[in-house]
């Protein structure tokens, strides 16, 4: 490896350990990181930093880093992003973080390699015991520490000559994930650490703003910070439903809540970090406009650049940004089952249905009282009202749900449809994912006899002008007038799995709201989109052909109707046949 190490060895599993100094380990790690960059990437990095030597002692200030990354000068995220890159660059010696030092070139290279999923995987040889989410949490927790505490840790940890263990496979193949200083995060008990809710909100909002693939310039999206921030708050409340914008500076998020929330509610949220520092690895003029994913061209109240960014935390990027087609928007086509059917039933590919509104505050209207007779409140949910989980803060908050349906829509007055890929999402005021279970298969129904639309329900009881909904333990129900919606969450045993909190408890609650927006968007692969376009073109051609036939026979038909006295002005109310 080009560095001398002592000969003290001991056998451990399939690798052995040797003793090295802190300085030796750091140099070996830096050499490994550099080897994971291509020559053109190293060249571009030096050109962008205006240095000739990769070992240059130049240190980047926050202003220089902001300019290099193309961030707006006064963006609220600048300090958090700069400190994240800087602290990540101290890897693996996190107890040696110096709050007074800038970002050196070796630190920047470490941050580049560690933040990119491909190089991270190669560096740690795909060892699943060392998780990227753990590393991100640790860095954010260090950012949340008071500076005097960071300086105290620095004073007690700096020792270039300290003896450390280096894990080797074979003669010189270093197994970094099994090195003690890396495996235990520089002797840090990560499970006892906390992340500031404010830093987390800023960090997540930044990730949403840069989530669009192949974005060459962050400034345009970051200039819309407040719009992304509202969706970032939806994500933050997923970690702790009691967090509000006012309590951001006083609230914290622990390790268990951070990891479980990332894994179950927003598995893709950290993916934008993959390209965070990519702009430094390319010459500025080398990215053309054709390389950039175009802006989303069709926006509605529920679907726009900001909501798509949040949706991409649970769904694939290519689906969110290039495979959506507007099918039905209630505010444009009317809130009726017939309009819904006419717009959606010809789409023979997966769809995402979005439902949004505000909690019902006036419970004395005739229409709602009738709906409450058809869908009685859950006693179990009423008994739990006022719990710590209680509905994410206040009645004025907008509730937004989405349902991914893998099969095409159809009328189902007797049997439900859908498959195991059907998934319910909550998007505001917090985010949650409710995947299908194997216990029941009542995934979806579209009932044209007065039963409305249901996900996770049995078909409603409809007889003698009586309607009774039969909701599942985790279900989303829309009445036949597309006016009211209920999300019920009582526990296990239904067609969808419930949310499980950090302490393994299952919250019991029910959200009832008046629908203000209802939209359906088609999605699928390029092949499916092309086939659908051909089908629609054929249907349009057939419709035009029928119109021509009607026009050709109009004269004969009218003459017959006039003879029967059914059309024309004959001075009489009608004729007889």
From Swiss-Prot:
BP-aspect Gene Ontology terms: protein-containing complex disassembly; response to oxidative stress
Taxonomy, superkingdom: Eukaryota
Key word Cytoplasm present: yes
Entries under InterPro entries matching the protein: TLDc_dom
Subcellular location: Cytoplasm
SMART domains per record: TLDc
Disulfide bridge map: none
GO cellular component, as recorded: fungal-type vacuole membrane; nucleus
Swiss-Prot/TrEMBL keywords: Cytoplasm
Pfam families linked: TLD
Domain TLDc span(s) in chain numbering: 301-524
Keyword Cytoplasm among record annotations: yes
Family classification: Belongs to the RTC5 family.
Function: May be involved in a process influencing telomere capping.
UniProt protein name: Restriction of telomere capping protein 5
Source organism: Komagataella phaffii (strain GS115 / ATCC 20864) (Yeast)
Gene behind the chain: RTC5
């Amino acid at each position: 490896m080009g560095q001398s190490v002592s000969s003290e060895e001991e056998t451990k599993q399939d690798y052995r350990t040797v003793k090295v100094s802190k300085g030796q380990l750091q140099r070996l790690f830096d050499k490994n990181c550099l080897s994971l960059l291509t020559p053109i990437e190293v060249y571009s990095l030096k050109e962008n930093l205006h240095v000739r030597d990769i070992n240059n002692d130049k240190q980047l200030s926050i202003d220089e880093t902001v300019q290099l990354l193309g961030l707006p000068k006064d963006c609220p995220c600048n300090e958090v992003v700069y400190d994240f890159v800087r602290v990540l660059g101290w890897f693996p010696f996190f107890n040696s973080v110096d709050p007074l030092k800038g970002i050196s070139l070796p630190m920047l290279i470490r941050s580049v390699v560690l933040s990119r999923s491909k190089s991270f995987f190669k560096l740690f040889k795909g060892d699943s015991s060392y998780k990227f989410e753990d590393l991100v949490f640790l860095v954010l927790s260090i950012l949340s520490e008071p500076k005097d505490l960071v300086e105290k840790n620095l004073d007690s940890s700096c020792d270039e000559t300290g003896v450390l263990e280096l894990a080797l496979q074979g003669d010189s193949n270093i197994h970094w994930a099994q090195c003690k200083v890396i495996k235990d995060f520089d002797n840090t008990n990560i499970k006892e650490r906390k992340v500031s809710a404010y830093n987390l909100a800023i960090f997540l909002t930044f990730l949403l703003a840069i989530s669009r693939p192949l974005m060459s310039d962050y400034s345009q999206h970051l200039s819309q910070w407040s719009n992304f921030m509202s969706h970032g708050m939806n994500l933050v409340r997923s970690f702790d439903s009691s967090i509000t914008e006012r309590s951001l500076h006083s609230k914290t998020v622990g390790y268990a809540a951070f990891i479980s929330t990332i894994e179950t509610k927003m598995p893709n949220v950290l993916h934008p970090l993959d390209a965070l520092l990519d702009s430094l690895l390319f010459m500025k003029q080398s990215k053309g406009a054709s390389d950039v994913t175009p802006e989303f061209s069709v926006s509605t109240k529920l679907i726009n650049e900001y909501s798509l960014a949040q949706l991409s935390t649970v769904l694939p990027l290519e689906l969110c940004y290039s495979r959506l087609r507007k099918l039905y928007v209630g505010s444009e086509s009317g809130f009726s089952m017939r309009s819904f059917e006419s717009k959606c039933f010809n789409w023979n590919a997966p769809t995402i249905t979005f439902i949004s509104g505000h909690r019902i505050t006036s419970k004395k209207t005739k229409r709602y009282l009738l709906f409450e007779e058809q869908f009685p409140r859950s006693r179990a949910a009423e008994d739990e009202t006022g719990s710590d989980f209680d509905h994410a803060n206040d009645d004025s908050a907008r509730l937004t749900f989405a349902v991914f349906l893998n099969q095409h829509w159809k009328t189902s007055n007797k049997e439900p449809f859908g498959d195991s890929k059907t998934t319910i999402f909550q998007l505001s005021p917090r985010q949650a994912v409710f995947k299908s279970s194997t216990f029941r298969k009542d995934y979806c129904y579209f009932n044209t006899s007065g039963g409305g639309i249901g996900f996770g329900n049995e078909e409603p009881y409809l007889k003698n002008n009586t309607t009774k909904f039969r909701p599942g333990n985790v279900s989303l129900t829309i009445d036949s007038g597309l006016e009211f919606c209920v999300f019920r969450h009582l526990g296990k045993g239904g067609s969808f799995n419930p949310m499980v909190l950090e302490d393994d408890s299952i919250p019991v609650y029910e959200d009832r709201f008046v629908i203000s927006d209802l939209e359906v968007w088609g999605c699928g692969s390029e092949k499916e989109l092309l086939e659908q376009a051909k089908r629609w073109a054929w249907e349009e051609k057939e419709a035009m052909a029928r119109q021509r036939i009607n026009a050709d026979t109009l004269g004969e038909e009218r003459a017959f109707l006039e003879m029967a006295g059914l059309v024309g002005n004959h001075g009489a109310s009608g004729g007889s046949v």
